[in-house]
């Protein structure tokens, strides 16, 4: 009877050791993956509404080395605005070669869509932008909700390719919105 009890204790200790080893390995692996490939972002405003809302936490897929051809109009990216020493998630609207025009004290982004049709997007006053063509490796990033009082390229200026660090992905929190982007 004592032998069975001793064997049972040894099995439990061994199982506990294996469980702890697996738990530690999984934790270290998750930390490394997060450090290298992903990060999270907390949305503190409704500027990206309706897709991302205030209080959402989303996964950002980090870029290793980004080229101008990998950024597309409509991408939602995490970037560093040097002028404000801040990191924001915003949508790419203006691409290198697009034109910023001024008419009636309003600024407009003039660009060709995917079908080659000329389009324009009104941006209001936009004190951070000046008339002209967007230079190579420069992008115009805007909030989805242009009525929101939020910082973007209209107030902070253009973002350069080297300042774009990640692409927005799935919502982690709240769980009810995890697989929805509406």
Where are these regions (language model features)?
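Hydrophobic membrane-insertion alpha-helices, especially the h-region
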Residues: 17-36
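N-terminal active-site beta-alpha-beta segment that forms phosphate/nucleotide-binding
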Residues: 35-38, 42-43
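Soluble "head" domains of membrane/secretory-pathway proteins
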Residues: 2-16, 41-42, 49-182
